[in-house]
């Protein structure tokens, strides 16, 4: 009888997972997510909401690293991190309040954007920089992988995020 569900799966599987939990949760439950893109998942949730009285508030904590897996977990990951919520005019205000309270309780600084503005903003400040880092690393590796032996901190800082999961980032790029 869960009344709050947070989906933390790759972008490509969010719709499928959302449909599954939507069917399983009791009426009036609240669902949120941590996906990097919002337009599609919010539209899917609003379509599902037409059939069952559950609420969805899209969420995106701007936190994390290029590392993945349980061994890389950090208790302080969300402290001071911006968390973007993406309600629409159909989102119940009390649902937004509950999700905001959740994120603030773990140290997040909540801001609210509509799904389209969210996707445009994170494309500019997160997705494009990641693509640039990938392209830079790819270019250097194609020139001569030995060049990495003389790379200094600036290059490593610029390309650190290129070490993130290419599968996850492929999904993000395709969705936004």
Task: Locate predicted features.
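Rossmann-like NAD(P)-binding element
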Residues: 1-30
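Glycine-rich, N-terminal phosphate-binding loop of Rossmann-like dinucleotide-binding domains
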Residues: 8-10, 35, 87, 135
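Alpha-helix N-cap/loop-to-helix initiation residues
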Residues: 14, 38, 66, 91-92
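Rossmann-like NAD(P)(H) cofactor-binding subdomain of soluble oxidoreductases
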Residues: 19-71
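Short, flexible, solvent-exposed loop/turn segments with mixed acidic/basic and small polar residues
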Residues: 72-77, 170-171
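Internal alpha-helical scaffold of NAD(P)-dependent oxidoreductase catalytic cores
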Residues: 75-163
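NAD(P)-dependent Rossmann-like dehydrogenase/reductase catalytic/cofactor-binding core
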Residues: 159-175
């Amino acid at each position: 009888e869960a009344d709050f569900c947070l989906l933390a799966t790759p972008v490509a599987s969010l719709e499928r997972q959302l449909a599954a939990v939507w069917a399983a949760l009791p009426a009036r439950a609240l669902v949120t997510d941590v996906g990097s893109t919002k337009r599609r998942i919010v539209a899917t949730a609003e379509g599902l909401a037409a059939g069952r009285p559950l609420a969805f508030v899209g969420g995106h904590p701007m936190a994390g690293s290029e590392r993945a897996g349980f061994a890389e977990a950090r208790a302080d990951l969300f402290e001071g991190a911006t968390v973007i919520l993406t309600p629409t005019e159909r989102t119940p205000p009390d649902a937004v309040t509950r999700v905001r309270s959740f994120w603030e309780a773990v140290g997040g600084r909540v801001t609210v954007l509509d799904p389209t503005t969210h996707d445009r903003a994170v494309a500019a400040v997160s997705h494009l920089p990641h693509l640039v880092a990938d392209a830079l690393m790819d270019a250097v590796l194609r020139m001569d992988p030995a060049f990495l032996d003389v790379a200094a901190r600036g290059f490593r800082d610029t390309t650190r995020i290129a070490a993130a999961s290419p599968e996850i980032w492929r999904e993000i790029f395709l969705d936004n």
